[in-house]
C-alpha cells in the first residue's frame, strides 16, 4: 500500500518547543503534532513502512510517500521502496541544500 507520510511536503526546520510548532496544511495553521497521525496509523498497527522520495515541491523541498507492507514483510517493503524510487528518478537533493 502507498500512503502519505505527512500532510505536507518537507518544511523548513522549526527549533521552537515541540508544542509550539505549527504547519500550514491547505492554508490552515495546524499543530505540528497532528502531522504524526500519518505515520502513527501505520506504526500503531505494527506494520512495516518505508518512506521514499517522489520529487520536489514548488518550494524545492522533498516530497515523500510511505510504502506499507504486511506484517513481517519488512524486506519486501524496503525492496518495493527501492524499486519505485529508482523508477521515479531517485532522490534529488534540494538546491538550497547541495
Q: What is the meaning of each model-derived region?
A:
Residues 1-44, 95-97:
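Serine-dependent amide/ester hydrolase catalytic core
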Amino acid at each position: 500500500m502507498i500512503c502519505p507520510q505527512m500532510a505536507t511536503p518537507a518544511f523548513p526546520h522549526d527549533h521552537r518547543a515541540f508544542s509550539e510548532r505549527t504547519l500550514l496544511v491547505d492554508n490552515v495553521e495546524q499543530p505540528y503534532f497532528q502531522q504524526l497521525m500519518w505515520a502513527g496509523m501505520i506504526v500503531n498497527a505494527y506494520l512495516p513502512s518505508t518512506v521514499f522520495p517522489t520529487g520536489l515541491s514548488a518550494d524545492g523541498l522533498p516530497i515523500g510517500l510511505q510504502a506499507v507492507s504486511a506484517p513481517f514483510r519488512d524486506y519486501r517493503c524496503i525492496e518495493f521502496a527501492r524499486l519505485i524510487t529508482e523508477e521515479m528518478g531517485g532522490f534529488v537533493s534540494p538546491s538550497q541544500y547541495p
